[in-house]
Every structure is written in C-alpha cells, then in structure tokens.
Amino acid sequence: MSRAALPSLENLEDDDEFEDFATENWPMKDTELDTGDDTLWENNWDDEDIGDDDFSVQLQAELKKKGVAAN
C-alpha cells in the first residue's frame, strides 16, 4: 500500500493585523444623539417589582384566580 505525498503546510499564524485608521476628532454634537436627554433607556429597566405593563397585570390577576402567591 503506497502513501500519496501530502502537500507541505506552511506555518499558519493568526492573522491579527488590522488596518490602522487616522484618528478623527469629531465635534461632540456629531457624536451624541440629539435627544435632549442623556439617558438612553428607562431608569427602571431592571426593576422586577414595577409590574405596570399589561402582561404583568394580567399575570397577577391570573395568579390570584389560581390562588398562587406571587413573589
């Protein structure tokens, strides 16, 4: 049984070179949203006890009907 010649593989390195771009100094008015408010999301986005949306209200009502205590 003869073995076919395997092609030689060159040393493969990670291609981690990136193109360098010139630094641009943009005016602040061009780099920020013109909302007049520096908050991009609701301040209570992670509050679990807010419960004022329709889904939460319906879920609470359904849980009360079933007699399940909600946390």
Swiss-Prot record:
Residues 38-49 are annotated as: UBS-I. The gene is rpn15. InterPro entries: DSS1_SEM1. Belongs to the DSS1/SEM1 family. Versatile protein that might stabilize multiple protein complexes involved in diverse pathways. Subunit of the 26S proteasome which plays a role in ubiquitin-dependent proteolysis. Acts as a ubiquitin receptor of the 26S proteasome, by interacting with ubiquitin chains linked by 'Lys-63' and 'Lys-48'. Involved in nuclear export of specific sets of mRNAs. Links the mRNA adapter mlo3 to rae1 for targeting mRNA-protein complex to the proteins of the nucleoporin complex (NPC). Involved in recombinational repair of DNA. Keywords: Cytoplasm, mRNA transport, Nucleus, Transport. It is found in: Cytoplasm; Nucleus. Disulfide bonds: none annotated. Pfam families: DSS1_SEM1. Residues 16-25 are annotated as: UBS-II. One of its GO terms (molecular function) is molecular adaptor activity. Two unstructured ubiquitin-binding sites (UBSs) mediate interaction with ubiquitin. UBS-I is the strong and UBS-II the weak binding site. One of its GO terms (biological process) is double-strand break repair via homologous recombination. This is 26S proteasome complex subunit rpn15. Residues 11-22 have a biased composition (Acidic residues). SMART domains: DSS1_SEM1 (SM01385). It comes from the Eukaryota. Residues 1-38 are annotated as: Disordered. Interacts with mlo3, rae1, nup98/nup189 and nup146. Interacts with rad24. Interacts (via UBSs) with ubiquitin (ubi3/ubi5). One of its GO terms (cellular component) is cytosol.
